[in-house]
Amino acid sequence: MSSDWDEIKRLAADFQKAQLTSTLQKLSERNCIEIVTLLLEKQLLDVVFTNDGKEYITPEHLEREIQDELYANGGRANLVEVSKTLNVDLSRIEALAERIAADNPQIHLMLGQLIDEDYITHIAQEINEKLSQRGEISISDLTSQFDLPSEFLQHNVMEKHLGKTIKGRQDATNPRVFFTQAYIQRCKAKIRGALAAITKPTNVSVILQQINVQEKIFHSLLDEIMPAGQVTSKQANAQYVPHIYAKTQAEWVNSFYKQNSFLEYEAINKLGISDAKAYIRKQFPNEQFLFLKRVALGAHLIELTVVSALNECSATKQYLDLATILPSNLSEEDIEEAFDAVMAQKHCNPSQFVYLQSIVFSQAYLTQLIQPCHDMAHALAKAAIDSGAYQQYIVEKTLAQKGSNSSANFDADDDGKVDKRDERRKKAASGKAGGGAQGRETKTKSTKKHQRGRAAAHNHDSDDDEETTQQSAGSSRKSVKPLELVKSSDVINRIKSTLEEEGLEHLAKPIAGLFVNQLNQAALAKAQELYEATPQTNRRQTHAAIQERVNTLLVDLRLYEKGIKLFNTDTQAQLIKYLLKSLGNDICNELTLYVAAECSLSVKMTNLNVDQRIKLIQECDAQYRNALLEQNKALNKSIEDFELATEAVLKTCSMIIKKADKKKDRALIVSHKEKLMQQLSECREPALLLHLAALILFTTITGCILHASGKFVSTILQHIRPTLNESQNALLLRYHDLVLQMLQQGTTDSPESKSLNEQLQTLQAEVVDLAQNFSRVSVSKAD
């Protein structure tokens, strides 16, 4: 090591000698570089190279230059700028800056900047000057101004120089806010002056805008000022209410309530009080009020005036005009609301009164008023029986109920889609039956031809799971309107004269509306009583009609079964299930309702499901019960089982079972097809049109009729496909695909839906023509 040092000394001496000698004896730049490199390799020299590598400097000298830059920049130097100025790598500058900050407590390294105490003192002086001008300052403002961390400004500047360089104090509620005492005094003076000048409720925001004081300072100084008023809250919409105004408000409210025993919310709101109900409760803590929508009624007004008057009205069996005992400025709605509230509070028995247009009638008064109308209702019931109007109503109602029962039911898989299918549901047509005598030994003949033909095409839903085939056996049915024996005009004419004497004739119509249904029901009950007292021949006619109707449905069932047997086993099972749930359900309803009537059971519903029928059957006589229960169970079995169960029920009801007649069956099939064609010619809905066309073609090709819902259309088309030629099959397949696409669209307003509808309209005439004009002869020619 000593030899190396001796060599270095020798080289240094040679270097000095070379500098003192002439140019020819100086070291070259290369030699100088080699010497410095050798010193660095032997770690005998520590230097810092510039970024361009042309110069180098010792760390001590670089440290002095950094401090010089800090001084030259006023005590705050950005290390990035220092690196650019000194042309030294930033990492070297940062390392030396950390050492400078660690060695010198007067210098701070903060966010890549060197800051000395002189600069901190300087910004403290600036902050003090700004604070003296504004009176209040926050750390957030200083952070944005000086671009320094808030914590550094908080602890190293503000709190360190507070009370020394910075003349002010720190907010106790918010340590990041500083202000001067003079500023606080000015704010107090502004607030005190503004509040002293206010004589009516004023929004706090308006006050702050006028005096230019922050809201938080306003609320913090408000208690110290002790103003002659109060602030409603510390929310954005708070108001300052001076005591003098509150006193005036209270005096007005007390005076009005003392004179009238009620208070209007609108009048209180006009005084500047937003929550009238809360103010009333606060102003009258010991008073009981009935709070309505527009007014608050005092308890003594209710107890001493309204309740006592109502009790007197009930006791005297008269009526009461509430408008005459309540304040005149209450509207009719207010009076009605007050009456409802009194009834709700159980001050009086609600069932004893009827309210009509501010007039309260006691039930006893109305009962006496309507009493003559009961005699009129009985007279009208007798007149309906004598004229046959009630008997006609009973027949029409029975046929309508049967028609509803024989309408095709929805398939079990489509229960969730009832709404869409109901929109397209049509009423089925009913068959007309002839009369006959009751008894097993007497055969009954039909007096008219069976007019049947099932509207066997029906509702298609959006998933192409369409339901359902409508069945008809005669002219189309319409829903029967309830029989109106007692009309509103009859009641009005009967009570109007009595009301005119009291000056209440304008209430004749509302009163009649209250009792017309009751009187009509009484008249219908009387008519039913008279009807049941008529000769037994009426019962025999009903027996014959039910017998004819059930036999007609059984014939339909057998004819539909023939068509079902043409399909494969799986499809047969589905079609049989659907047939029994629709047509079989109608037969069960017919017989169950007939037996219920024979057993004197009252049945309000006519379209019963299995559970409802079973519940009703349990109440019937024992002689019918087992047969009816077996019939209901047979709905889930085969058609043969159901027919046997139905025949057993017919025998228990003393009804005759007709034998099959092939000639009549052929006529019925032709009639059914004609009905379908008539519906097809009138149909405009593509899905229903395709359904009808498929059923007509099936009947034409097979000679059998079919009871199938819309979801079986594709199965029917597949079954008749071999009988049709290629063009006919292509037409039906194309129309079927377009129908499916239209149902899947879901909306009729889109361009795609309009385009599909146009295509369907184009093909509609061809489909109708194919269904109406197709025959077996044409099939043979095509083949």
Swiss-Prot record:
Biased composition range(s): Basic residues: 445-457
Function: E3 UFM1-protein ligase that mediates ufmylation of target proteins.
Enzyme Commission number, as recorded: 2.3.2.-
EC class of the enzyme, as a word: transferase
Signal peptide: none
One Pfam family matching this protein: UFL1
Keyword terms, alphabetized: Transferase, Ubl conjugation pathway
GO cellular component terms given for this protein: endoplasmic reticulum membrane
Identification of the protein by name: E3 UFM1-protein ligase 1 homolog
Chain segments carrying region Disordered: 404-482
